[in-house]
């Protein structure tokens, strides 16, 4: 049988090693790695013995598909026939008289490319799976229930009474006290409660803060009562939160203010802020 040649362009040493490994594993033992096709001994001998064969005849001879049978290998390899495309399907510009051009081959080696793709995918999977990835699991139902419980506790509980003003014991001394007094006069007046010593700030045109201080800290009576239960408070805003959280709707509170409460508030105002006793507004 006349020798047949399969030309595969290799663009790197790594590709050449991969091709050699694949051929060895499949039982092929006769192959050469050449930089110049003219250096092949068989091709050189043919050119010397048959100089009259034209280039067209060689191309016609090589145009038919060829098959290679696997040789005996010590490894268990199934006998198979590999069909390669003919030279006529390859562009003539790929092979020159000086050797093989360093370009990407138009005749691809399928198994090598598939192996490279598989190896890249495996490396990518290993890289992704090797990263520490911690998933935090949230119990949305538990968080929602906890938030609802906190909100209900905040709305239904007794409001925390924070006096409006500052304690007289924290007054600055010296020049700082003078500057603080000037600043206080510019934004409003501070009045010290005679019962608890808390300084309450009130606007120049009103006394609402003083009244709230007296009712919240020094009186028992509360003017607002829930229409659905016995809850009492002195602020409408707190009553609204209570009705929404406990009864599911915004129910206007019932004003239970009577003369006894007004008298209590007036007496407390006289003790807390004597200068406002004549105009407390509770008995008007």
UniProtKB/Swiss-Prot annotation:
A zinc finger (C2H2-type) spans 224-247. Coiled coil: none annotated. It is found in: Nucleus. PROSITE patterns: ZINC_FINGER_C2H2_2. Residues 50-60 have a biased composition (Basic and acidic residues). Signal peptide: none annotated. Expressed in FLP neurons. One of its GO terms (cellular component) is nucleus. It comes from the Eukaryota. The keyword Nucleus applies. InterPro entries: Znf_C2H2_type. Residues 50-71 are annotated as: Disordered. Keywords: DNA-binding, Metal-binding, Nucleus, Transcription, Transcription regulation, Zinc, Zinc-finger. The keyword Secreted does not apply. Its main location: nucleus. One of its GO terms (molecular function) is zinc ion binding. In the presence of polyglutamine, mislocalizes to the cytosol and loses its transcriptional regulation activity, but is able to promote protein aggregation. Positively regulates the RNA polymerase III-associated transcription of small non-coding RNAs. This is Transcription factor lir-3. It comes from Caenorhabditis elegans. The gene is lir-3.
């Amino acid at each position: 049988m006349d020798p047949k040649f399969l030309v595969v362009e290799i663009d790197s040493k790594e590709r050449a090693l991969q091709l050699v490994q694949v051929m060895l594993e499949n039982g092929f033992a006769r192959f050469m790695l050449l930089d110049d096709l003219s250096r092949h001994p068989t091709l050189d001998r043919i050119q010397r013995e048959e100089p009259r064969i034209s280039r067209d005849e060689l191309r016609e001879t090589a145009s038919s598909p060829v098959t290679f049978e696997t040789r005996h290998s010590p490894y268990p390899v199934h006998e198979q026939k590999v069909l390669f495309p003919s030279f006529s399907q390859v562009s003539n510009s790929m092979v020159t008289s000086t050797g093989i051009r360093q370009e990407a081959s138009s005749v691809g080696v399928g198994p090598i490319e598939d192996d490279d793709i598989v190896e890249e995918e495996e490396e990518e999977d290993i890289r992704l799976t090797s990263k520490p990835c911690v998933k935090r699991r949230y119990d949305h139902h538990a968080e929602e229930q906890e938030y609802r419980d906190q909100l209900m506790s905040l709305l239904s509980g007794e409001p925390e009474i924070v006096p409006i003003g500052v304690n007289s014991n924290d007054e600055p001394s010296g020049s700082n006290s003078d500057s603080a007094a000037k600043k206080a006069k510019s934004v409003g007046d501070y009045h010290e409660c005679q019962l608890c010593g808390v300084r309450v700030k009130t606007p120049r045109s009103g006394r609402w803060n003083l009244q709230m201080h007296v009712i919240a800290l020094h009186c028992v009576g509360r003017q607002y009562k829930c229409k659905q239960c016995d809850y009492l408070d002195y602020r409408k805003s707190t009553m609204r939160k209570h009705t929404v959280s406990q009864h599911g709707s915004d129910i206007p509170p019932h004003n239970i203010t009577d003369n006894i409460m007004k008298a209590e508030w007036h007496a407390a105002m006289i003790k807390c802020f004597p200068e406002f006793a004549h105009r407390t507004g509770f008995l008007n």
